Amino acid sequence: MSVTLAIDAMGGDHGVVVTVSAACDFLEKHADVKIALVGDPDLIKQVLSKSPKAPMERIQIILASEVVLMDDPIEVALRRKKDSSMRVAIEQVKEGAADAVISSGNTGALMAISRYILKTLEGVDRPAIATAIPNELGRGTTMLDLGANADCEPMHLVQFAQMANVMVQVVDGEQNPSIGLLNIGEEVIKGNEVVKQTSELLRQTSLNFYGNVEGNDIFRGTTDIVVCDGFVGNVVLKASEGLAKMMSGLIREEFNRSLLTKLMAVCAIVPLLRVRKRVDHRRYNGAVLLGLRGCVIKSHGSADRFAFGFALDRAYEAAKNRMVERIAAAFVVETKV
């Protein structure tokens, strides 16, 4: 099965320098992939000219005259910039010309435009943002929602769990993923009313519901999936990113303190590199916008060429394994339970 990916080539902090270069790398590894690069043709061609091995027969350049900036209000991105690279890329999925779209652009705008153009799956009240967070087991804990829905009702959280359950099966190959509900304690008596009601509803489904989990369980890998509302999820995500940057800076500072500590760093380089690889956030790049009638992947705005490649990987696996169709089918089954 051939897979076509539409890329918002202008999105993110680095634009075409990252997106187009990463696309060329990806095409070299996947002979069954075609890519549509959406944006300024002149800028796109400049980068392509530096990649002589790029299989041009599998690359399509689509003109888009506008760009959604990272600080653009959602209203501007949605109503005024109707020829933005982000919007035109999403329209490729809507029209069936692409199987998935990837953008490093403004998250709020991406969700709003995707929801406006693609619409939500039947029965889905609200789309959610899901991504993997590094854990000590060496694989990611899938967490959602990460900011799309600050306030949620119990049934919204149940729907998030249902959609993530299929996504983890499709993208990560975990056939019966365990699901945890983020709470202030494992006991069923703890938490607010929304969490308590959600827990009860999840126990009534056919999902592999583990029960309540705490914040530290995310990084332990206690469950494959952790569900929470978007307010809590975004706080957890930003806090974990901040902690990782702080620890990295402190370690670098300590090893550069003196000649002796620099020598110690040389001696410890192998285990340090192993640890860095296991927690490298770039390897977990590519959040999925779940609940839409199309596959939409959000890459981190600051993603480099290496990180953007992982977002393309995620889009490829989701599209190849028909994630959206399988979520729609499984969702209907679960909602009948």
Curated annotation (Swiss-Prot):
Compartments where located: Cytoplasm
Disulfide bonds: none
Record key words, sorted: Cytoplasm, Lipid biosynthesis, Lipid metabolism, Phospholipid biosynthesis, Phospholipid metabolism, Transferase
Pfam families, per the entry: FA_synthesis
GO biological process per UniProt: fatty acid biosynthetic process; phospholipid biosynthetic process
This enzyme's EC code(s): 2.3.1.274
Entry's transmembrane regions: none
Domain of life: Bacteria
InterPro entries hit by this protein: FA_synthesis, Phospholipid_synth_PlsX-like
Pathways per UniProt: Lipid metabolism; phospholipid metabolism
Catalyses which reaction(s): a fatty acyl-[ACP] + phosphate = an acyl phosphate + holo-[ACP]
Any single Gene Ontology cellular-component annotation: cytoplasm
A GO MF term: phosphate:acyl-[acyl carrier protein] acyltransferase activity
Similarity comment text for this entry: Belongs to the PlsX family.
Quaternary structure note: Homodimer. Probably interacts with PlsY.
Role of this protein: Catalyzes the reversible formation of acyl-phosphate (acyl-PO(4)) from acyl-[acyl-carrier-protein] (acyl-ACP). This enzyme utilizes acyl-ACP as fatty acyl donor, but not acyl-CoA.
Protein name: Phosphate acyltransferase
Gene transcribed to yield this protein: plsX
